[in-house]
UniProtKB/Swiss-Prot annotation:
Source taxon at top rank: Viruses
Main location: host cell
Protein name: Putative transmembrane protein ORF112
Membrane-crossing segments per the record: 26-46, 50-70, 80-100
Source organism: Acidianus bottle-shaped virus (isolate Italy/Pozzuoli)
Length: 112
């Protein structure tokens, strides 16, 4: 089975040949949905096993992708003051943002 999906501007350099997909990479999960759903019916049928397998991963993938987009400007600001932390800054910021959002939600909804 070969995937007939080609890269676009959204995911440059990501052609999925022989359906070798790292489902733990949220960017690739989002890309496979983007390509399959913008394509033809045949594109959806060819990638149906991948789409079904990654369906439970889609909400967390979208959540972490949005967190990543939100952390990019913060990373640029922190990079000015702490350039040595550049390789690990995005994971630190995402961890902090997720922790703060959970703390705020728990106060609003009284979760314990």
């Amino acid at each position: 089975m070969s995937c007939q999906i080609y890269p676009s501007q959204m995911c440059p350099g990501k052609a999925y040949k022989n359906c070798k997909l790292n489902i733990m990479n949220f960017w690739e999960v989002i890309c496979i949905y983007y390509f399959a759903l913008q394509g033809s019916f045949l594109g959806i049928l060819v990638n149906l096993p991948i789409l079904v397998t990654t369906l439970p991963l889609l909400p967390p993938a979208l959540f972490f992708y949005l967190m990543y987009l939100f952390a990019l400007p913060l990373k640029d600001i922190f990079n000015i003051f702490f350039p040595s932390l550049d390789p690990i800054l995005i994971p630190i910021l995402i961890f902090f943002l997720v922790g703060v959002s959970r703390a705020r939600l728990s106060k609003v909804f009284k979760w314990r």
